[in-house]
Swiss-Prot record:
The keyword Chloroplast applies. This is Monoterpene synthase FDS-5, chloroplastic. Its EC number is 2.5.1.67, 2.5.1.1, 2.5.1.69. Mg(2+) 1 binds at D145, D149. Mg(2+) 2 binds at D145, D149.
Length: 394
């Protein structure tokens, strides 16, 4: 095997007194330490399919989650009573974990690949805590996105705001989730040299993401009046800002900062990651219509909500005048019969094939750019990111 990351199969020996964070127990000890095997000169370059964490990661990652959640619901900055504490705990459990946790895992994955040697207990804890910050951030984004879209399900269960006892309270809950990120950062990273850069990174990413959400929302107002306003360039702008920065760039940038790097030195890496992040969002557009809700845990509403998705933008690019007329008459209307007519046009234009062509070209171009980077460790990080997303619809 060219490269691997593994955790000892021996169970960790818990010793709270030796933990760099006295309030929690360590989940990685010196006897159960993350190790990284450097390829020798005779070995091939990193194989992204083998740079994965051990099967123990999920349970260890969740242990850190429980620690962070406990800290938040006992935050001395607010005087919790039983009702408020139970509400916040339930809300966190409902909205933060439960997905694939790709962003959170990517922080840990990437930091290990960059360091290239065993992690200390503190490093392992901090990498997971930072990973959870990206998951908390996503929960905030998704909670508000679901409300704005009028979505019904998320990750195979009703959206948080759809619960009878929640409703509009979810607006405040979303803001609370966003504030939790800063509470975690302050508690565990304030003394680090890169703390201010982490805060800036999350603040800038939030601005880009909610600005992208704004474009997505107001473009629908124009599209409802005149569908021809939609284009591939508009879709690209939406997916770049609404999802690419926080989905792909944020986790890797967190790992780079924790490793002591200056993000200004990684402009090329940022460009690659933003392109991959856009691919991730376009993949979501594809799955919204062509994915199985039972598999992906979400009922698609892009057609009904008149979104400027990759599919409608591509359809308008390929359609003849008659097909464009049908799309204009039926797109953006909450009527199953009209949604079906839009999907008929999608199938007639072979948008599945168009998406697969885009996906193949994206993979080839991204891999070429990744291999051009001078650092093998950075190549491994980028390849791992690409492989996690590639053909996620299969």
């Amino acid at each position: 095997m060219a490269s691997f990351i593994s955790l000892s199969s021996k169970s960790a020996s818990w010793n709270a007194s030796s933990c760099p964070h006295p309030s929690v127990q360590p989940f990685v000890t010196r006897k159960n330490v993350v190790r990284y095997h450097k390829p020798t000169s005779s070995e091939p370059s990193y194989s992204p399919l083998t740079t994965t964490l051990s099967s123990n990661l999920n349970s260890q990652f969740m242990q850190v989650y429980e620690t962070l959640k406990s800290e938040l619901i006992h935050d001395p900055l607010f005087e919790f009573d039983d009702d408020s504490r139970q509400w916040v705990e339930r809300m966190i459990d409902y909205t933060v974990p439960g997905g694939k946790m790709v962003r959170g895992y990517s922080v840990v994955d990437s930091y290990q690949l960059l360091k290239g040697e065993e992690l200390t207990e503190e490093e392992a804890f901090l990498a997971c805590a930072l990973g959870w910050c990206t998951e908390w951030f996503q929960a905030f984004i998704l909670l508000h996105d679901d409300m704005m879209d009028g979505s019904h399900t998320r990750r195979g269960q009703p959206c948080w705001f759809r619960l009878p006892e929640v409703g509009a309270v979810a607006i405040n809950d979303g803001v609370l989730l966003r504030n939790h990120v800063h509470r975690i950062l302050k508690k565990h990273f304030q003394g680090k040299a890169y703390y201010v850069h982490l805060v800036d990174l999350f603040n800038e990413t939030e601005f880009q993401t909610i600005s992208g959400q704004m474009i997505d929302t107001i473009s629908r107002l124009a599209g409802q009046k005149e569908l021809s306003k939609y284009s591939m360039s508009l879709n690209r702008r939406i997916v770049q800002y609404k999802g690419a920065y926080y989905s792909c760039y944020l986790p890797i940038a967190c790992a780079l900062l924790m490793f002591g790097e200056n993000l200004d030195d990684y402009v090329q890496v940022k460009d690659i990651l933003v392109e991959l992040g856009m691919y991730y969002q376009i993949q979501n557009d594809y799955l919204d219509t062509f994915g199985d809700p039972n598999v992906f845990g979400k009922t698609g509403t892009d057609i009904e909500e008149c979104k400027c998705s990759w599919l409608i933008a591509k359809a308008l690019e390929l359609a003849n005048e008659e097909q464009k007329k049908i799309l204009s008459e039926n797109y953006g209307i909450k009527d199953p019969a009209k949604v079906a007519k839009v999907k008929e046009i999608y199938h007639a234009l072979n948008l599945k094939g168009a998406y697969e062509d885009y996906e193949t070209n994206l993979y080839e171009n991204s891999m070429k750019a990744i291999k051009a980077h001078p650092s093998i460790a950075v190549q491994a990080v980028l390849k791992s990111c690409l492989e996690k997303m590639y053909k996620g619809h299969k």
